[in-house]
Amino acid sequence: MTDYKDTLNLPQTDFPMRANLPEREPQTLARWQTLDLYRKIRKDREGQPKFILHDGPPYANGRAHLGTAFNKTLKDIVVKSKTLSGFDAPFVPGWDCHGLPIELNVEKKLGKDKLSANAFRQACRDYAFSQIELQRDDFQRLGVLGDWQHPYLTMDFGYEADTVRALAKIVANGHLLRGQKPVHWCAACGSALAEAEVEYRDKASPAVDVGFEAVDAEAVRQRFGVKNATTRVLVPIWTTTPWTLPANEAVSVHPELHYALVKSELQNQPVYLILAKDLVDSAMQRYGVDDYEVHGNLKGDALEGMQLQHPFLDRIVPIILGEHVTTEAGTGNVHTAPAHGLEDYFVAEKYNLPINNPVDARGRFIPDTFLVGGQPVFKANEPIIVLLADSGHLLHSETIQHSYPHCWRHKTPLIFRATPQWFIGMNKNGLRERALAEIEKVTWLPAWGEARIGKMVADRPDWCISRQRLWGIPIPLFIHKKSGELHPKSPALMEKVAQLIEKESVDAWFDLDPKVLLGDDADHYEKVTDVLDVWFDSGVTHFCVLEKRRELKVPADIYLEGSDQHRGWFQSSLLTSLAIRDKAPYKSVLTYGFVVDSQGRKMSKSLGNVILPADVVKNLGADVLRLWAASMDYTVEVNVSDEILKRASDAYRRIRNTARFLLSNLYDFDPKKDKVAVDQLVALDRWAIFTTQKLQEKIITAYDRYRFPAIYQAIHNFCTVEMGSFYLDIIKDRLYTSKESGLPRRSAQTALYYIAEAFVRWIAPIISFTADEIWQFMPGDREPSVFLTQWFSDFPNAALSGEEEQRWQLLLQIRDEVNKALETYRNEGKIGSALAAEVVLYADERLNAAIATLGEELRFVLITSEASVLPFNEKSKAAFDTALPGLALEINVSEFEKCARCWQRRSSVGQIKEHADLCDRCVSNAFEDGEMRQFA
């Protein structure tokens, strides 16, 4: 048999079938760096409309984990898609560099006491730099394009100085206040914590009912209408923090709740109890009392001012009114310790009660505290409970499990502790109302984010922005020693401090002699040594970065972070921006769910489910990780596992194989010379171009709406359905067997060229390394990188009428039914390949109209050696119905010889003496002018 291989146009390409991403991606990275790609993009997009995605700074501590890898990948997808849309979309990465975790690492390594404060801060700075280098390498290895040589760092002298300037504006605008307020306090940190640094965990706590005895029992009984009695009156409170009882200054009742006087016997003595009417039964059940009488009924406001004896201190405390009292649990009477609770503080403030804080910064009672002096607060619970039991004031005690605030770093329980702190006042100058109004103007993605952050802002307390740490940006203020007032020239003085910090670092403030700035006034003022909450540091990036860097702008078009940032960076950015310039720093905010394993569990070493991005990149490649990120529904928790990543790897392989097919059939195609005009295209090729163009519109819209899973699905379906199992399959015969430069082949190549030009751009934001690798093998003159282009727009006008479009949709369905039938025949051993079959289609009028025009070329669509169409009502006995209404099939095994070149079984094989093993079509294609195709 003659070998006709040289007469075929077999696919050729140097684009490798095996991706080998772990080795090939670093080569692409090196090329990008040699090319200075990021700078080239900036120059290319100069003068175009700006699109700013502002990078929320990750903490400079440890290698990138899967959550931060997911974060940076989504951001990179957005930035690259906007670049392809023609925007100037710079990406300036940043790092959050101050704060406790860095302090703890340095302390562990070097010891805090061995270093001066300045040396300790320098060690923290050095440590942060080392961590930034690690993370920068991780993010670049993921293919994230950005200004990695000029990131913003919250510890840069310039940034620290601008943070002071931001605070100065907030001071000048009247939003800063100082107060002895209770704040979340971590004894291990020795500092106040922000709301965003608090996490809730289950904790076992003692729950006790404690009786406060009425000083004038007779007057109380009379208020309830009980006369001629001598029994004592107790007001029971219920608390899970007995250790706060030494700081008790009042008992709160709700002014509108109804309270009952309950007569009973407790500890073998008659007693009257004042309880919220709705809680009488549950309280008495808790006290183990079945026999009791309810006497009288008063609203809470009638109890105001009643005096009670503290259960173990020589202190008389009043009953006061508080709207925070509920009947969800307890007694309706709330133990009020203004130093240890925000609601307690606010209600006590109305009554001008003292703020008695007996707990020091280490979480221990001060030495002269009765009974528990020097003890850690949680250990003080036991002796207090014993004392209450011995004195007859303990009505009930049990241990309960409940959700309790913990330090995000130490995982230890927090306390509320009143200390002198600096706050941004939520109700000062209408900040809360303006924040809520501004939230409504922002686009929140998903939409439920608006309600979430709105509720948080509506309910949040004043923001405590001061910390008692070494490593941080100072709050450079002077307070008058007698009046406690800020220096009247504070904003101007802060600018002078900012100028010093810009040159010398934050040490300039801590080393500063107040006389340098204040002169003789220095004796009257105290220098503040607190530092700023790190959420303030990162919260003013809109001022220190967006407003300061020439290539950026404020407001940013989008902030994109995890959903936990509704209470973190989104809030701190919003509040500081409003306090500075009275508008939000962002136009839209996109959030995503936490990255968890396939069972919805957080990544944990103890569970053994931790997947490191570095390992994924090393084993599968960054593009597989990026494809996984794009495929996930980020509006909920994001699942990852080895199996899920394997599926992403399989999907990647399909995309790569599609690209390889396109490239391998364009090896001899010069778009300048070989493109076929649209009016000369084979109909199937025109359909393919039209389908590609339509899909591109959907893909660009999905990119614009940040619907990445929809893009992934669209590309996956395009590779597997429209292209893989239909179009590319059909045109193989034409590509390989038609005349090399003939119209049928050049028509198919023209379509493949347009598809490749569009396709490589679609995938570029997601699998960036692979897209740029494909780009190097594309035909024609082009830019050195796909990222220096825009979405492909040079499509010919290949629009189809609605009728034509419908016809091709029906052909897809018909071919699907034929394929299923042929597969059955293959499985039964009746045929080896589809080309061994001859198919008769019995079609109703609707289907007949779709396929009749194809005539002889129908067999190319079905990839059979013969295909004919007959009316549906002429079905033979051998025909069988399909799942498509109006279509029946009859499949016969061809009796003809197989063509040695195209493998089709045709009656013309053996009829041409010079080429007895070829069909007439192959003789024409190989040795004559070549066949013509109109439809397929």
Swiss-Prot record:
Binding positions (L-isoleucyl-5'-AMP): 561
PANTHER family the record matches: ISOLEUCINE--TRNA LIGASE, MITOCHONDRIAL, SOLEUCYL-TRNA SYNTHETASE
Record has Magnesium as a keyword: no
InterPro entries named among the record's database cross-references: aa-tRNA-synth_Ia (IPR002300), Anticodon_Ile_BEm (IPR033708), Ile-tRNA-ligase (IPR002301), Ile-tRNA-ligase_type1 (IPR023585), Ile-tRNA_ligase (IPR050081), M/V/L/I-tRNA-synth_anticd-bd (IPR013155), Rossmann-like_a/b/a_fold (IPR014729), tRNAsynth_Ia_anticodon-bd (IPR009080)
One GO BP: isoleucyl-tRNA aminoacylation
Short sequence motif 'HIGH' region: positions: 58-68
Gene Ontology CC: one annotated term: cytosol
Self-association state and partner proteins as the record states: Monomer.
Domain notes: IleRS has two distinct active sites: one for aminoacylation and one for editing. The misactivated valine is translocated from the active site to the editing site, which sterically excludes the correctly activated isoleucine. The single editing site contains two valyl binding pockets, one specific for each substrate (Val-AMP or Val-tRNA(Ile)).
Residues annotated as binding Zn(2+): 899, 902, 919, 922
Residues reported to bind ATP: 605
Protein task: Catalyzes the attachment of isoleucine to tRNA(Ile). As IleRS can inadvertently accommodate and process structurally similar amino acids such as valine, to avoid such errors it has two additional distinct tRNA(Ile)-dependent editing activities. One activity is designated as 'pretransfer' editing and involves the hydrolysis of activated Val-AMP. The other activity is designated 'posttransfer' editing and involves deacylation of mischarged Val-tRNA(Ile).
Name of this protein: Isoleucine--tRNA ligase
EC number: 6.1.1.5
Keyword flag Transferase: no
Cofactor note (record): Binds 1 zinc ion per subunit.
Subcellular location, record wording: Cytoplasm
Keywords per UniProt: Aminoacyl-tRNA synthetase, ATP-binding, Cytoplasm, Ligase, Metal-binding, Nucleotide-binding, Protein biosynthesis, Zinc
